Amino acid sequence: MGSQTEAVMAEAFIAGAVRTAIGKRNGSLSGVNPVDLGAHALRGLVDRTGIDPAAVDDVIMGCVSQIGPQTFDIARNAWLSAGLPESVPGVTVDRQCGSSQQAVHFAAQAVMSGTQDLVVAAGVESMSIVTMGSTVTLAMQAGMPAPFGTGWRERYGDQEISQFRGAQLICEQWGFKRSQLEEFALESHQRAVRAIDEGRFDSQIVPLDGFGQDEGPRRDTSLEKMAGLAPLRPDWEITAAVASQISDGAGALLIASEAALRRHGLTPLARVHTLAVVGSDPVLMLTGPIEATRKALARAGMKVDDIDVFEVNEAFAPVLLAWSQDTGASLDRANPNGGAIALGHPLGATGSILMTKLVYELQRTGGRFGLQTMCEGGGQANATIIERV
């Protein structure tokens, strides 16, 4: 107390990053138990880095729909299912769609604090097996109340709270038209197809039973086909074509201290530079990445043009359009290999998948700084700046 000497935090490095290919709903991964899906990513990370798994201090795994096979601490169950040491604990995180980005934050913070040296940050979600929203609908069928109490209703009323309405409200407040959303969505598919054809994802994917290519991108989609889809509601701009796909997948990253890098002979891919998280309007729900990006850049003493690559989750096309307009970030540098509209959004896995994509894209291009941000249920967003090393 009273010391004028500031504590110097340790640095956290990403020493490994892998992901599964992303499966479509009822696609190639739909028959894989999510515990085994997560286990595959964890085992792939251990094999890729060559780390002694017993040296890992903790496993932090994001997962949104924690019911059925995704409950009972799937982080622990996936680690054990991978045949990895019982001595290593695991904890499961729910910050909605940003769950495994938050896992990266928690892992980095543990390393930066000096309390841990080697932490796995991961994410998993099987939306084919555990349907989106089932944690609420099944509970209500069993007689349990909705996850909004008296205080919530007194504050926000009984208006609809959903990601779909949030996306439409963004269109209305920012003035986006359906044609703009569809043009953005088409570009996402085209970028993803190009990335697949050029093999940009090959080194980051650990194939599962021969499945090693993202199956969401549509090669034959067009503005004409998108225009033929019905909107979610008659007077809305939002259609299925401009929303992220329901998907299955998993990802895992190894976060290490500088001492752990030396001790275990690890080669870092990136340094965790800056962490930020914000709350935002829970009714709009999806605008948090705007303020999270600003907060991360301000904390880092950087400007938007200092970032070489952005990974911004494409929950819906208007999320990216509003984010770009308000932050000044160019969409040319955002999601260069396609986003969730084309590749899919396996909820709790997406944060780890986006971070893996970001790390590898910086390695591929030689860029220095990357920023990842995601909108999250409840009106929240994480932002992470990493630096290639």
Sequence positions of predicted segments:
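Flexible glycine-/small-residue-enriched beta->alpha junction loops
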Residues: 118-173
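Condensing-enzyme catalytic core mediating Claisen C-C bond formation in acyl metabolism
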Residues: 2-34, 224-287, 291, 298, ...
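Conserved catalytic cysteine-centered active-site region
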Residues: 63-117, 157-162, 220-245, 326-353, ...
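Short, well-ordered amphipathic alpha-helical segments that serve as non-catalytic structural scaffolds
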Residues: 34-50, 74-78, 103, 163-170, ...
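Active-site-proximal alpha-helical scaffold in enzymes
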Residues: 95-125, 171-200, 252-259, 346-365, ...
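Active-site pocket-lining segment
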Residues: 168, 201, 211, 273-342
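Conserved beta-ketoacyl condensing-enzyme motif
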Residues: 30-118, 124-142, 205-215, 283, ...
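N-terminal extracellular/periplasmic Venus flytrap/periplasmic-binding protein-like
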Residues: 18-20, 31-35, 39-40, 48, ...
